[in-house]
């Protein structure tokens, strides 16, 4: 009979140990990815025009000969995680995968700014203080570590604010790729206001695709004050908790998950005012996550739950359908419709 410890078979214990160690060292996943972006390796491979050998790569990187083996180790691990493909012919070489193509700077779809922003110690380092944060009654995690709320911190730190805006713009480009196939969202509209629209990455795509549609990018004054519009694109500074420009539709992309239910109700009520002015009955379009552990694949659920923890550190949250529905009803909306948008994002349309 096989031995056991506390009623557990050794095989169970060793499997649990492997799981534990996987998560203890999971920070290396993020940090090795950050290293590849900082070293500009995706662009180096792209510019090489074919898989690049280890010797060519380290020559371009100009690393000491004593670190060549370490470059190989990092590339091997990144390849194991799906970011590069190892080609073994005469010499070990590396090719881009779909994932690392998303890290090529200068490409239409580049998420390198997202890697840099999220993995900056300003943000990622805050997670060392989870224990302290959990005992603080009102402070967000960033309030504990940065000494102010996240949005106030951005206002006072222009360099990181630029990094954050670049990251959001890079992510918007992928969302825009999905929106191009969502004509039904914009059918019949004459105007739309993108609340929290940043520098206008999404609004510009909407304007190009629907040139007769008037688009307003509405964000904090310090975000939009130096931005120039076009014939059908304007920038307006203000506070979404106070008032939102009137339009046929309001777009909330990655906005509501930043806020508590109480704050979301305030925002949604202002949105309702904006789309029902002058007797009109417009709509509010939300691009956000909808947690559904029953229907989603495990990897998609993991992304959503990771983001839920991340949003909790802002006092926000990701929501399931019932939680969304409760918000909509309390804000005075009559019905809603949820459609899939990307791998983990949904398109939610709500009507007053």
From Swiss-Prot:
GO biological process: methylation
Self-association state and partner proteins as the record states: Homodimer.
Name of the protein this chain belongs to: Isoflavone-7-O-methyltransferase 8
Residues that hold S-adenosyl-L-methionine according to the record: 196, 219, 239-240, 253
Chain positions recorded as substrate binding sites: 118-127
Keyword terms: Methyltransferase, S-adenosyl-L-methionine, Transferase
UniProt similarity note: Belongs to the class I-like SAM-binding methyltransferase superfamily. Cation-independent O-methyltransferase family. COMT subfamily.
GO molecular function terms listed in the Swiss-Prot or TrEMBL record: isoflavone 7-O-methyltransferase activity; protein dimerization activity
EC number of this enzyme: 2.1.1.150
Entry function: Transfers a methyl group to 7-hydroxyls of the isoflavones daidzein, genistein and 6,7,4'-trihydroxyisoflavone. Can also methylate (+)6a-hydroxymaackiain with lower efficiency.
Reactions that this protein is recorded to catalyse: a 7-hydroxyisoflavone + S-adenosyl-L-methionine = a 7-methoxyisoflavone + S-adenosyl-L-homocysteine + H(+)
Positions annotated as active site in the UniProt record: 257 (proton acceptor)
Enzyme type, top EC level: transferase
Pfam families: Dimerisation, Methyltransf_2
Pathway: Phytoalexin biosynthesis; medicarpin biosynthesis
Origin: domain of life: Eukaryota
InterPro entries: COMT-like, O_MeTrfase_dom, Plant_O-MeTrfase_dimerisation, SAM-dependent_MTases_sf, WH-like_DNA-bd_sf, WH_DNA-bd_sf
Lineage summary: Eukaryota, Viridiplantae, Streptophyta, Embryophyta, Tracheophyta
